[in-house]
A protein has these predicted regions:
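Ankyrin-repeat boundary/"N-cap" motif
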Residues: 9-22, 44-63, 88-99, 121-129
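Short coil/linker segments at helix-helix boundaries
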Residues: 62-72
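Generic detector of contiguous secondary-structure segments
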Residues: 21-48
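Charged low-complexity stretches with an acidic bias
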Residues: 78-83, 87-89, 97-103
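Terminal, low-structured helical/coil segments at or just beyond the last alpha-helical repeat
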Residues: 106-130
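Structural detector for tandem alpha-solenoid helical repeats, activating at a conserved register
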Residues: 30, 73, 104-105
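Ankyrin repeat domain, specifically the short helix-to-loop turn at the C-terminus of the second helix
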Residues: 2-8, 33-41, 72-84, 111-117
Length: 130
């Protein structure tokens, strides 16, 4: 992929990865949200990375290159659409990736979503028994 490409060209670039992974790579939050809302799998794997692992890697990379504070919007979008932070690919999960890259905000988000999901699942199970 050429750095001089327009956003439209980059999104249409033929790569081995899915459109959702390309949206993550380009930090296109709106495109990622639309793709997930249209049914893209939040846990899809491309190039030995889940979308969540890719998001964490991209967020850290962008912060390191720009000197700006780290952003966790991609991580938050994926977690909101049900990405599993503990899904392992080649023995590593997004949670491990965040710890390794010291993406503390992503770790806190994954902890909160994991707790929230567990609480919601328990509430749903209780509600179904009635």
């Amino acid at each position: 992929m050429d750095a001089s490409m327009t956003m439209a060209e980059a999104l249409n670039y033929k790569s081995p990865c899915t459109p959702a992974h390309r949206a993550v790579e380009l930090s296109e939050h709106a495109t990622l949200t639309r793709l997930l809302d249209e049914g893209a799998d939040a846990d899809e794997v491309c190039c030995r990375m889940t979308l969540l692992m890719h998001a964490i890697d991209t967020e850290v990379d962008v912060a390191n290159q720009s000197g700006e504070p780290i952003d966790s919007a991609l991580t938050a979008v994926l977690l909101a659409y049900g990405a599993d932070p503990h899904l392992a690919v080649n023995g590593q999960a997004a949670y491990d990736c965040a710890r390794e890259l010291r993406h503390d905000m992503a770790i806190r988000l994954m902890d909160r979503f994991s707790t929230r999901t567990t609480k919601l699942a328990a509430r749903f199970r209780r509600g179904r028994r009635r």
